[in-house]
Amino acid sequence: MAITKKILLPFVLTILFVISSVHCSDDTQGFGIKQEYKQCYTPDPCRKGGNDECERFCVAKSGLLYGKCINDGSKDVCCCLTK
């Protein structure tokens, strides 16, 4: 059975697509951003508007974060956490 150009080209393109898909996947165990992020900042947003202002402050830093006022013992500080 002869392999014609009509069959060979789609076959090669399919193989290249499959190989590139495998290399681009990030399902490898132990890699990626799976941990929780928590970064606390000044208490200013919490003083200005509580959790709502802290939320706006964190979303402005990154759309992947949410804000929460957390008491650190003496005052509320604005902490940005992962969603």
UniProtKB/Swiss-Prot annotation:
<feature type="disulfide bond">
    <location>
        <begin position="54"/>
        <end position="78"/>
    </location>
</feature>
<keyword id="KW-0929">Antimicrobial</keyword>
<dbReference type="GO" id="GO:0050832">
    <property type="term" value="P:defense response to fungus"/>
</dbReference>
<dbReference type="GO" id="GO:0005576">
    <property type="term" value="C:extracellular region"/>
</dbReference>
<feature type="disulfide bond">
    <location>
        <begin position="40"/>
        <end position="80"/>
    </location>
</feature>
<dbReference type="GO" id="GO:0031640">
    <property type="term" value="P:killing of cells of another organism"/>
</dbReference>
<keyword id="KW-1015">Disulfide bond</keyword>
<keyword id="KW-0964">Secreted</keyword>
<keyword id="KW-0611">Plant defense</keyword>
<feature type="signal peptide">
    <location>
        <begin position="1"/>
        <end position="24"/>
    </location>
</feature>
<protein>
    <recommendedName>
        <fullName>Putative defensin-like protein 111</fullName>
    </recommendedName>
</protein>
<comment type="similarity">
    <text>Belongs to the DEFL family.</text>
</comment>
<feature type="disulfide bond">
    <location>
        <begin position="58"/>
        <end position="79"/>
    </location>
</feature>
<keyword id="KW-0732">Signal</keyword>
<feature type="disulfide bond">
    <location>
        <begin position="46"/>
        <end position="69"/>
    </location>
</feature>
<keyword id="KW-0295">Fungicide</keyword>
